[in-house]
Amino acid sequence: MTIEEVSGETPPSTPPSSSTPSPSSSTTNAAPLGSSVIPIVNKLQDIFAQLGSQSTIALPQVVVVGSQSSGKSSVLEALVGRDFLPRGNDICTRRPLVLQLLQTKSRANGGSDDEWGEFRHLPETRFYDFSEIRREIEAETNRLVGENKGVADTQIRLKISSPNVLNITLVDLPGITKVPVGDQPSDIEARIRTMILSYIKQDTCLILAVTPANTDLANSDALQIASIVDPDGHRTIGVITKLDIMDKGTDARKLLLGNVVPLRLGYVGVVNRCQEDILLNRTVKEALLAEEKFFRSHPVYHGLADRLGVPQLAKKLNQILVQHIKVLLPDLKSRISNALVATAKEHQSYGELTESRAGQGALLLNFLSKYCEAYSSLLEGKSEEMSTSELSGGARIHYIFQSIFVKSLEEVDPCEDLTDDDIRTAIQNATGPRSALFVPDVPFEVLVRRQISRLLDPSLQCARFIFEELIKISHRCMMNELQRFPVLRKRMDEVIGDFLREGLEPSEAMIGDIIDMEMDYINTSHPNFIGGTKAVEAAMHQVKSSRIPHPVARPKDTVEPDRTSSSTSQVKSRSFLGRQANGIVTDQGVVSADAEKAQPAANASDTRWGIPSIFRGGDTRAVTKDSLLNKPFSEAVEDMSHNLSMIYLKEPPAVLRPTETHSEQEAVEIQITKLLLRSYYDIVRKNIEDSVPKAIMHFLVNHTKRELHNVFIKKLYRENLFEEMLQEPDEIAVKRKRTQETLHVLQQAYRTLDELPLEADSVSAGMSKHQELLTSSKYSTSSSYSASPSTTRRSRRAGDQHQNGYGF
């Protein structure tokens, strides 16, 4: 059976016969399966080949893999029907060969010019002599990798047009070798495996795994490397070669049925030309006849007709590839469309070269205007490139105001750093040498001003945070576009940095003025201020609730003093102590009011209030005026009396502090002061939380939005700076050229896909057929490899397979 029989019908005048059709049977004009789909993909491959390794679009293709001398080249030549590949005992395929088989119509004269080959590196040359094609492959390989068995991953692209082939595209890769020869590196096996994996790892790739029948299939290099990327065997087709040289008594039936290593797409067995056939110049067509004769003479292979022979392999590859392409077409078109949009956008960012001054001025003005618009859009949250994964632009400014600045101020307790002794000291210092009947205003104002001044640093820090955010926003604007002009980018960064610093100064000055205004006028008439009466009531309540009374045990022989006398004594004592430096004492000690209560009432009535009363001792007696006037005694008595009247004071220390113990009245005064501080601090804090963001927005943020464009025009729009600022680095010119080429290729590819006829657009049908292929049981048909009428009809009706699925 020949390829011609598979691809078309015999003339109607030829009746069905049980004899084998002759190899010269002509093809009909019926379009073979995938007559338009595969050529379109071939055209896409040629288009994307212009980009070389830069292409990121993976196209559907069939990749041939196998170990060295496994028969890959023989299979490819059998599919073409001509000798055209380099041959030898050593490695022959040293560069990937992309082989596009294109079926053409047979000419009436049947001349030798019906078949020809074209290399992509020689687009204007047609090779009608296939031996010349072999020599060109060898020459092109040697031009790149030398003549001493080196390998490379640069493709050789060959298109063969012939009426005797089916539309198939295959990629022949170097065979897997174990031992380096010639100038091959020591890691030649790893390099070849890496090259193979780079092709077959794509889901768009079908794998044609070639394994000789005289080796163990479980140890097949081709199947092993295919299983790495296709472990389930969904896109791997097995080819068993050299069936004619298996040991006597053995056959490949179990292998072909998939009983050893199952593959979803099945196996095909073929017979290769031996070295003797090549030496005797036997043609491929003669080898196909010999292959057919071999399978006829082996009854073990009867019933496996659809799994035997090169013609069946060609038909199977054609059908699987067509349906594979149809399944992938929607995604392929989508990927090309997305790549086209992305490349067009990138190319647009590089712009066009402008050499005239007028053009340069217009270009610069356009850049400055777009930059200011992008800057404002980021601040206002209207940018199209706004991130969805994090806060950016103006949202970060709002976060700094509310979640950092305001929250930090609200967490501050104005009395946190003030102890009760600090407040008591401030109160006593404010009274001077006098005793205060009420809590004085001065200590409250001093303490509240001190707390207000603490708000200056966080307010200035907030302004600095906003300044840094504005700098970050300026760096994010038009990042890709300004990569084209690094000098302009640098100048713009300098201008906007200086401009923002100029806006930061009045912002900080205004913040300082706001704090100064709050400190200069303490408005105790504010409606939200707690006020004196409420503060006293709250303080009394807090003091009473915090103190638990403890009864004092009195001695049994102590006479309870008169309540009126005791009360009067307490008032006098308090008044006196108030007059004595407001209760500030040194280490001499203080006589408390309780000590006065312990004195008898008679002594209290006879004793005068004065300095001696502070230092009451156990043996000390009061010296009256009459005793001083009585002088009947001797001089010694007078000296003793004089000495008794002398009171020596210790000098006060350098640092004076209030006493550690304080009265209930002092506790109330401290609580009142704290309440007043907290109440007024809350008022000022709210004012600062409102005024500081307003000052920053006015003097820094909004001022930048309003005036940035004018500043750019003033600083940068100068004719003598045009050429310097619009100078491009060399890499930009290279990128512009590369993206322009890529854009042209993608546009060609997109137009090529639009040329697909209705056959290629039947995606749903193609997908269903592809699923049918994966689950088909037709691989196990019982028809024999013979010239039975049923087999002949199936061969002749290959053109109907387009409508009836795969029909293997």
Curated annotation (Swiss-Prot):
Keywords: Cell cycle, Cell division, GTP-binding, Hydrolase, Mitochondrion, Motor protein, Nucleotide-binding, Peroxisome, Peroxisome biogenesis
Gene3D superfamilies according to UniProt: Dynamin, middle domain (1.20.120.1240), P-loop containing nucleotide triphosphate hydrolases (3.40.50.300)
Protein name: Dynamin-related protein 3A
Record's compositionally biased regions (Basic and acidic residues): 554-563
Membership in a protein family: Belongs to the TRAFAC class dynamin-like GTPase superfamily. Dynamin/Fzo/YdjA family.
Binding site for GTP: 66-73, 172-176, 241-244
SMART domains assigned to the protein according to its UniProt record, in alphabetical order: DYNc, GED
A single cellular component GO annotation: peroxisome
Chain residue ranges for the region called G3 motif: 172-175
Disruption phenotype: Reduced plant growth. Increase in the size of peroxisomes and decrease in the number of peroxisomes per cell. Elongated mitochondria.
The protein's assembly and partners: Homooligomer. Interacts with ARC5 on peroxisomes and ELM1 on mitochondria.
Expression across tissues: Ubiquitous. Preferentially expressed in flowers.
Listed InterPro entries: Dynamin (IPR022812), Dynamin_GTPase (IPR001401), Dynamin_GTPase_CS (IPR019762), Dynamin_N (IPR045063), Dynamin_stalk (IPR000375), G_DYNAMIN_dom (IPR030381), GED (IPR003130), GED_dom (IPR020850)
Region feature G1 motif, mapped onto this chain: 66-73
Chain residue ranges for the region called G5 motif: 271-274
Main function: Involved in the control of mitochondrial and peroxisomal division and morphology. In association with PEX11C, PEX11D, PEX11E and FIS1B, is involved in cell cycle-associated constitutive self-replication of preexisting peroxisomes.
